[in-house]
Amino acid sequence: MYVEPIATDQVPSGVPANRDRLFLAACVSLIVTAMTFAIRAGILTELGETFAISDVELGWVNSMAFLGFPVAMIIGGAIYNQVGPKNLMWMAFVSHVLGLVLTVYAGGFWGLIISTFFIGFANGSVEAACNPMIVDMYPDKQTQMLNKFHVWFPGGIVIGSLVANFFGASLGWQGLIWIMMIPTVIYAILIFGQEFPKSQNIVNDTGANFKGLLNPLYLFMFVCMSLTAASEFSTTQWVEKILGASGAQPLLVLALVSGLMATGRFFAGPIIHRLNPAGVLWISAILTSIGIYLLSTQSGAMIYLSAIVFALGICYFWPTMLGFVSEYTPQSGALGLSLLGGIGMFSMTVWNPVIGGWLESATAAATAAGAVGAEADLIAGRETLQAMIWFPLILVVLFGGLYFYMKNRPQVHADEAVLNPEAMSTPGSAR
């Protein structure tokens, strides 16, 4: 794992000397968060077969991770100054352990619902603890370190995808869940007995924040965030079910997409220095639409090429939207950013069961038309992707309008928005 070397740097006054160790712990905890996304995506079919639950029910199970995340993020953000990052990190550890153990010993649908909620809550707790902690530990290079921290979300998805792809058959889904206990225990060891930084956050004017939430630009982005999250997660979280019969390895597709996202975000500044945030969002929506269309029409090796286009589309969605709000509606403050990230994750609580229903209906229709086995699965997967394409297509229109509206306003370079420290406050900023 790469951690920015600071051995020759002077640690600022008031910052604990063990900040490198805490930063490493934060990165490992984010890897656990990402692995839960990747491995869950890889075992959905097996969970359905093991517990005899439908695609709609699998959608509800999936949605619990996206519900637990914003709940923890909002609660953690509200109590951070009172309890500090140490207690939030231990809350994340306990929730991760509970979620993983309860998943292994789940007896059916409701067991999976409860265990997946705990995992989502743990993931949100990691974000609530680590982002402000890193800001407090590295006041001299906040952007740089937050950027490197959040690379480990797509990086962790690559790790989880490869583990599931190469070891899933031999270990089974329970074995894959147990593997995630290894990095979970590692980050607990790294934080045990350590001194944590004191919060140096300035208390914002909450009344002004609430007024900022009524800004038309903020409300516009609030609506768009639900669609950008759906564009990304509706495909990546259902990749195994949708692309399983396409002739490509679904988890390798997920690893490819996540690897490109990590690389793209790591080098975000030089790549898109000349573009403004609205332009980045518009181009991203166009590429995402093309990518999902290609995924719904291609098979075999062409799926990997289609995945590259899709990855380029979703790469900058989330962090650029958070950066846009930070730059153009600053009055909304940290509250606005927290709610924006929360609605992005919460939207998948709504959409996951819907997508499961689409997949189930398409499979039934294909079977009724005479298709069987892999052929029926392929037809159903393609039809489901063709329904999902409406998410980014709507964004093409919305972000196109935003681009022309913003042309006559003072612009902020896209790299400033993408790499803004405040824009890194959710995992979406690195997903």
Mark where each language-model region is:
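Extracytoplasmic
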Residues: 21-55, 235-240, 351-355
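Cytoplasmic helix-loop-helix junction between adjacent transmembrane helices
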Residues: 115-151
